Amino acid sequence: MTAPFVLLAPLRAGEADAARAAIAALDEPFARVPGTHLARIQVLRPPPRRFRGTTNDYLLLAADHDGPAESWLAVAARELDAVLAHCAFWPGAADQAEVVRWARAREVRVGFSVVGAPHATVEDVGEALALRRFLSRFAAETAGFDDDALHAAWLAR
């Protein structure tokens, strides 16, 4: 089952540009985190508030993933360590328990997922897309076949 995870972590003062540069240097990090349906990471600057002084920049990490958040976070943290290192109190990616503790303390509970098939795993979706490609190709190759030829082509696949 797909689960959302949203994290909003304050960046250390003056590190927003470095965090943006670290994000820009990433090479599809979520492709290396198994079970990730979709994910986004970016630096946010909240609107200024009157009489509140300076406004901190934040790192937003939003993802829909398969399985327990703890195991997903452990792998994602290793891929994103160069970015997360700009966050206040980041413990580093080496200790999974500390990563989970840190992330859970900054988690924003959203209660919904934007994935179209929330009960399907990434693997299920991949298999369904492969089947769709196969059936589309088969339909194109057999267009105009009579019943017997179509049946024979199906059995020969």
Could you say what each language-model-derived stretch is?
Residues 1-58, 63-71, 96-157:
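Short S/T/G/P-rich N-terminal loop/turn motif that feeds into the first structured element of a domain
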Residues 27-30, 79-85:
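A common structural junction motif
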Residues 74-78:
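"Short basic amphipathic alpha-helical interaction patches in structured regions
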Residues 81-95:
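Conserved short beta-strand edge segments in small beta-sheet-based binding/regulatory domains
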